[in-house]
Curated annotation (Swiss-Prot):
Species of the source: Mycobacterium marinum (strain ATCC BAA-535 / M)
Subunit annotation: F-type ATPases have 2 components, CF(1) - the catalytic core - and CF(0) - the membrane proton channel. CF(1) has five subunits: alpha(3), beta(3), gamma(1), delta(1), epsilon(1). CF(0) has three main subunits: a(1), b(2) and c(9-12). The alpha and beta chains form an alternating ring which encloses part of the gamma chain. CF(1) is attached to CF(0) by a central stalk formed by the gamma and epsilon chains, while a peripheral stalk is formed by the delta and b chains.
A cellular component annotation (GO) from this entry: plasma membrane
Catalysis: reaction(s): ATP + H2O + 4 H(+)(in) = ADP + phosphate + 5 H(+)(out)
Record's bilayer topology term: Peripheral membrane protein
EC number: 7.1.2.2
Originating gene: atpA
Stretch list, region Disordered: 513-549
Function according to Swiss-Prot or TrEMBL: Produces ATP from ADP in the presence of a proton gradient across the membrane. The alpha chain is a regulatory subunit.
Disulfide bonds: none
Name of the protein in its database record: ATP synthase subunit alpha
Keywords: ATP synthesis, ATP-binding, Cell membrane, CF(1), Hydrogen ion transport, Ion transport, Membrane, Nucleotide-binding, Translocase, Transport
Length: 549
């Protein structure tokens, strides 16, 4: 009988091979249990190692965000449909913080706050993902605002100019044209986009928070008709969405925009509106049993907006020189800008445009209140030509508003006050502008020059806008060199000013008012003395011209 010749080494290697190829069928993961759920909030027991702002996975693939880390439970905000979440269901950790996909493929698309497309045009191929909670650029990483961002709205570009990297608040009651101002600004970037120059191009992100679905659809339609969807992304969290989506939407929009900013590009983001985001965050906080403060808002509602708006910046040249310009919208009640959320956002932003209901109802649109509106940064980014012609515009309009109130009670006014009232009425008429019709900056300069230079003083108020429109049509057709000079040099030299005055005076001769009268001012002629009447010749003593020093 043959002996077995198995060595100890063979046995050892066989055992090692078997142990090395062994895989366990068990895995270790933290699992929690839903204690109660409702109104978009769930309390989960277990999950001792969960992080704040971590994503949790509920049954059916529904996601939630861990916000409250209590001693025995976790308070989570459910993102999406929460109707099927019930007590006793299991909840898993994902080990990830909330992030969204970003990239150029998002241009022209409509997405939800999770970065998922909702426009029915298929999936979006993302370049990378970006966390929603990111630190804003530090002081060292920024530079001062020095490039203009033209809105195409005369009243804003002349009196409250906006620079690239600035945060300009648009504030006013409902139905005063806040969204229209921002949509006009997006439409006005089309000319820059068509140049193909990355230094001029401005990508746009429109964040709709708590808006009606029809409103979001009409904004999208206006952008498509204006050719602006090519460079715009819409982040939509309509009124029908949960409070969690409304809270997250502005952060999603800023994450998409920051990707381009850190890539050296220029971006404009519109938050429409942050009042509804604050209300959604208040609802979440109250449901999570956080202690309420003023107007029942939680104590960190200021931080909610400050950490969002501080992401708007003009980056230093070392970081590529990109910029993110923010236009947050705040809705007031009865023109009260001293309420909690309005004062918070006013203190965070670099200026505000205040839209007033009374002006809107009077037909002054955009209904910007000059006295309360201000830009604390943009003046440094205003082009020189606009600075020259619009220097006295704000003062003239403010004086007009004061005199207008006084004139209602005064029976007779002196000649100076009457002239100020007449000039002011024409300036107000000049600054009116139809919706979705932004104006190039060179045409704005000519338009403002008409008013502040006194060229409209002889034109009846009701004919001011027709005079402006027909003059600009004439200049586009016959004097294109004037527009190109202002556009290229961004200055209004003495030669350009003289040529412009000459064109205006020549145009006036052929322009007739609505009553058929000429708008050329009559030359002032002094009456003759009685003893000179009937004489063949009259000697007139003229003062000797003074010598120039």
């Amino acid at each position: 009988m043959a002996e077995l010749t198995i060595s100890a080494n063979d046995i050892q290697s066989a055992i090692e091979e078997y142990v090395g190829s062994f895989t366990s069928d068990t895995s270790r993961e933290e699992v929690g249990t839903v204690v109660d759920a409702g109104d978009g909030i769930a309390h989960v027991e277990g999950l001792p190692s969960v992080m704040t702002q971590e994503l949790l996975e509920f049954p059916g693939g529904v996601l939630g965000v861990a916000l409250n880390l209590d001693e025995h439970s976790v308070g989570a905000v459910i993102l999406g449909n929460f109707e099927n979440i019930e007590e006793g269901q299991q909840v898993k950790r994902t080990g990830e913080v909330l992030s969204v996909p970003v990239g150029d493929a998002f241009l022209g698309r409509v997405i939800n706050p999770l970065g998922q497309p909702i426009d029915g045009r298929g999936d979006i191929e993302a370049e990378t993902r970006r966390a929603l909670e990111l630190q804003a650029p530090s002081v060292v990483q920024r530079q001062s605002v020095k490039e203009p961002l033209q809105t195409g709205i005369k009243a804003i570009d002349a009196m409250t100019p906006i620079g690239r990297g600035q945060r300009q608040l648009i504030i006013g009651d409902r139905k005063t044209g806040k969204t229209a101002v921002c949509v006009d600004t997006i439409l006005n970037q089309r000319q820059n986009w068509e140049t193909g120059d990355p230094k001029k191009q401005v990508r746009c992100v429109y964040v709709a928070v708590g808006q009606k679905g029809t409103t979001i659809a009409s904004v999208r339609r206006a952008l498509e008709e204006g050719g602006a969807m090519d460079y715009t992304t819409i982040v939509a969290a309509p009124a029908s969405d949960s409070a969690g989506f409304k809270w997250l939407a502005p952060y999603t929009g800023s994450a998409v925009a920051q990707h381009w900013m850190y890539d050296g590009k220029h971006v404009l983001i519109v938050f429409d509106d942050l009042t509804k985001q604050a209300e959604a965050y208040r609802a979440i906080s109250l449901l999570l049993r956080r202690p309420p403060g003023r107007e029942a808002y939680p104590g960190d509602v200021f931080y909610l907006h400050s950490r969002l708006l501080e992401r708007c910046a003009k980056l230093s040249d070392e970081l590529g020189g990109g910029s993110l310009t923010g236009l947050p919208i705040i809705e007031t009640k009865a023109n009260d800008i001293s309420a909690y959320i309005p004062t918070n956002v006013i203190s965070i932003t670099d200026g505000q445009c205040f839209l007033e209901t009374d002006l809107f109802n009077q037909g002054v649109r955009p209904a910007i209140n000059v006295g309360v509106s201000v830009s604390r940064v943009g003046g440094a980014a205003q082009i020189k030509a606009m600075k020259e012609v619009a220097g006295s515009l704000r003062l003239d309009l403010s004086q007009y508003r004061e005199l207008e109130a006084f004139a209602a009670f005064a029976s007779d006014l002196d000649a100076t006050s009457k002239a100020q009232l007449d000039r002011g009425a024409r300036l107000v008429e000049l600054l009116k502008q139809p919706q979705y019709q932004p104006m190039p900056v060179e045409e704005q300069v000519i338009s403002i020059f008409l008013g502040t230079g006194g060229h409209l003083d002889s034109v009846p108020v009701e004919d001011v806008r027709r005079f402006e429109t027909e003059l600009l049509d004439h200049i586009r057709a016959s004097e294109e060199n004037l527009l190109s000079t202002i556009r290229d040099t961004q200055k209004l030299t003495e030669e350009t000013e003289e040529a412009l005055t000459k064109v205006i005076n020549h145009f006036k001769k052929g322009f007739a008012s609505s009553t058929g009268e000429s708008v050329v001012p009559d030359e002032h002629v002094e009456a003759m003395d009685e003893e000179d009447l009937g004489k063949e010749s009259v000697k007139v003593k003229k003062p000797a011209p003074q010598k120039k020093k």
